[in-house]
Amino acid sequence: MIKYSFLLTALVLFLRALKLEAGDIVIYWGQNGNEGSLADTCATNNYAIVNIAFLVVFGNGQNPVLNLAGHCDPNAGACTGLSNDIRACQNQGIKVMLSLGGGAGSYFLSSADDARNVANYLWNNYLGGQSNTRPLGDAVLDGIDFDIEGGTTQHWDELAKTLSQFSQQRKVYLTAAPQCPFPDTWLNGALSTGLFDYVWVQFYNNPPCQYSGGSADNLKNYWNQWNAIQAGKIFLGLPAAQGAAGSGFIPSDVLVSQVLPLINGSPKYGGVMLWSKFYDNGYSSAIKANV
């Protein structure tokens, strides 16, 4: 009996170790009203992190604007009910982030002071602070995702530093979604702070560094460069379907058999990020066991 108990304990510890070393799947949610609710997204049990997309207007004295496509209208106060969904996700151990920027929007940091003002706004309206005008209600998000693809290359480092300081009160996870050309045009300064917990690099819509023509050589080369930055974990960002991006889609069987084996031994390998929930019609389920 003692020997059996020892073997059982050893097996449990081994399986826990495997789970700790396994990668996670990250998904973007919020840009299509037909993609299902946030709660349903988390209930699939496929994702470890969900990025709510996007805060499309902020900085430079502008009134911040959250765009959740057909899900709800934040300007009319119709998104506060998402607090229940956010808590449902978090109760399952899933982190829920607010994503800033995106490919379309009006965002710009005009100065370091402007960046600090934006950080204070985010803390009070989405994170652990207090405000009477919280667009998503009283739920506290886990952190902020930087999906910056325009505006300015400056002051994102100050935004990251100020947000990070709030972690003294409650942990604020910082994540980023740079393009795969290295270094990233917009976020290089912010990433150089070394403050980011997770970085999911967009290996799509960028032919020089994505999977192309049956070859993962370019992807692997740029992956190695990204893996060398000072960050917690690096994720492979991909479209979840052919129609989710202009280029860079990798069929699930090819990803599992040819691409992931090239990168999942990297010290900072974190898993796979997918754009987006609307396009994820079985892709995450097909790769989950191998991520």
From Swiss-Prot:
Induction: By TMV infection. Residues 23-291 form the GH18 domain. Residues 1-22 form the signal peptide. One of its GO terms (biological process) is defense response to fungus. It is an enzyme of class 3 (hydrolase). It holds the Pfam family Glyco_hydro_18. Its EC number is 3.2.1.14. It catalyses: Random endo-hydrolysis of N-acetyl-beta-D-glucosaminide (1->4)-beta-linkages in chitin and chitodextrins. InterPro entries: Cts1-like, Glyco_hydro18_cat, Glyco_hydro_18_chit_AS, Glycoside_hydrolase_SF, Glycosyl_Hydrlase18_Chitinase. GO terms for cellular component: extracellular region. It comes from the Eukaryota. Its main location: secreted. The active site is at E149. Keywords: Carbohydrate metabolism, Cell wall, Chitin degradation, Disulfide bond, Glycosidase, Hydrolase, Polysaccharide degradation, Secreted, Signal. It is found in: Secreted, Cell wall. One of its GO terms (molecular function) is endochitinase activity. Disulfide bonds join C42-C89, C72-C79, C180-C209. This protein functions as a defense against chitin containing fungal pathogens. Belongs to the glycosyl hydrolase 18 family. Chitinase class II subfamily. This is Acidic endochitinase. The lineage of its organism: Eukaryota, Viridiplantae, Streptophyta, Embryophyta, Tracheophyta.
